[in-house]
């Protein structure tokens, strides 16, 4: 089991400190603030539909993680003396030994290595949990996310939807 207290200090490409940590129950406001700071096109690339708000059911799904079948990390940085969530990543077990990953990073921090840090930590946690494979569904135009996943060894696999690129990473 991945501890709900997981926390690692890292640095962005520009040298600023960042914390990659487990999502906590009290992070909902910070997560929603991060979504508000993310442009609609970035959210569409993450959710595959135009998204500006979430239903109560969606919020509950995103916040109710068990760190076994649903693992979620946030990227948090100090902004003007206050912690601010600037990104998040998660994996959800979709069948025994396999999980799907997804990420979102606030636009102002894209290109600073946040997505790569989240990916690295989720891959490490998935290996520690003895998962055999991670997968991600990415829109063809989401080149930045495709590049991040490619650096970690994700490769194109056959998916069900021709409008979406299905990537997989064997962990074993």
Label every model-predicted segment.
Residues 1-172:
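Long, contiguous binding/interaction regions
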């Amino acid at each position: 089991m991945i501890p709900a207290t997981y926390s690692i200090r890292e640095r962005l490409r520009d040298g600023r400190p960042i914390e990659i940590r487990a999502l906590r129950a009290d992070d909902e406001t910070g997560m929603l603030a991060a979504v508000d700071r993310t442009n609609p096109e970035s959210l569409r690339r993450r959710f595959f539909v135009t998204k500006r708000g979430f239903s109560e059911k969606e919020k509950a799904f995103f916040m109710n993680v068990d760190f076994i079948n649903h693992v979620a990390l946030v990227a948090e940085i100090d902004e003007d003396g206050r912690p601010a969530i600037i990104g998040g990543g998660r994996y959800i077990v979709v069948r025994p030994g396999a999980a799907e990953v997804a990420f979102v990073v606030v636009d102002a921090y894209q290109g600073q290595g946040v997505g790569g840090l989240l990916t690295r930590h989720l891959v490490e946690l998935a290996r520690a949990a003895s998962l055999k494979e991670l997968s991600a569904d990415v829109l063809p135009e989401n080149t930045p996310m495709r590049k991040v996943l490619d650096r970690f060894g994700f490769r194109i696999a056959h998916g069900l939807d021709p409008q979406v690129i299905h990537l997989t990473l064997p962990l074993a």
